[in-house]
């Protein structure tokens, strides 16, 4: 984790606490970001939290960015950030339905088709709808593996057996590869979320 990311998280936790919003911090170790995101989502679904905030290890942000994400009461809100390529170019990984007709919504929001999960706020209802519409995404593990993963996410019950779904996965369709975050956006959009 970059120092700037850790400072962003600490400042955000402080701002949330001062606003009376309870927040919890959860991280996992995994060489696969898809597996890590699915594990974290599983732990979130077992919790009594309403929202999950995804934060990549190299993203810097202000507490105000997160507070603004909570205001509009949308199911999914992301704060796009520059693509980590050429520092002299400004490029964002967002997809608009019609880039020539971008409508500014209340709270200075815009609707996008796809966006990055590096700073994405997701309401629990999103995953509940995805579970209902896509039971085939359920991941099964041997008991010994489930026990290990439950410990990793601090689950007191069998969260892995109940909530481990493949929400976050890369896709390859029509010769186009998408990372797990853009594929998640597409999955949610297909489910009318």
Regions found by a protein language model. Name each.
Residues 38-51:
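Active-site nucleotide-sugar/metal-binding loop of Leloir-type enzymes
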Residues 191-193:
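Short, intrinsically disordered, charge-balanced linker/junction segments flanking boundaries
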Residues 17, 70, 189:
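Anion (oxyanion) recognition and catalysis
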Residues 41, 62-169:
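Conserved catalytic core of nucleotide-sugar-dependent glycosyltransferases
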Residues 180, 184-187:
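Short active-site alpha-helical segment characteristic of glycosyltransferases
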Residues 169-179:
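Active-site neighborhoods of divalent-metal-dependent phosphate/nucleic-acid chemistry enzymes
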Residues 48-60:
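Short beta-strand-to-loop acidic/aromatic patch adjacent to the donor-nucleotide binding site
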Residues 1-31, 35:
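N-proximal low-complexity "stem/linker" segments adjacent to membrane-targeting elements
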């Amino acid at each position: 984790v970059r120092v700037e990311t850790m400072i962003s998280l600490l400042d955000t936790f402080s701002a949330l606490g001062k606003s009376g919003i309870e927040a919890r911090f959860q991280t996992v170790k995994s060489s696969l970001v898809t597996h890590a995101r699915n594990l974290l989502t599983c732990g979130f679904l077992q919790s009594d939290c309403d929202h999950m905030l995804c934060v990549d290890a190299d993203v810097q942000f202000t507490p105000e960015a997160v507070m603004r994400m909570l205001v509009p009461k949308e199911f999914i809100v992301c704060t796009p950030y520059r693509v980590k390529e050429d520092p002299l170019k400004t490029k964002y990984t967002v997809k608009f339905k019609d880039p020539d007709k971008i409508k500014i919504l209340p709270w200075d929001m815009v609707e996008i088709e796809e966006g990055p999960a590096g700073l994405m706020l997701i309401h629990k209802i999103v995953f509940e709808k995805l579970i209902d519409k896509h039971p085939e995404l359920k991941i099964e593990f041997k008991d010994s593996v489930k026990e290990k993963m439950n410990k990793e996410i601090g689950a007191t019950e069998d969260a892995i057996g109940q909530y481990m779904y493949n929400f976050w996965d890369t896709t390859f369709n029509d010769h186009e590869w998408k990372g797990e975050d853009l594929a998640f956006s597409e999955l949610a959009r297909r489910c009318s979320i």
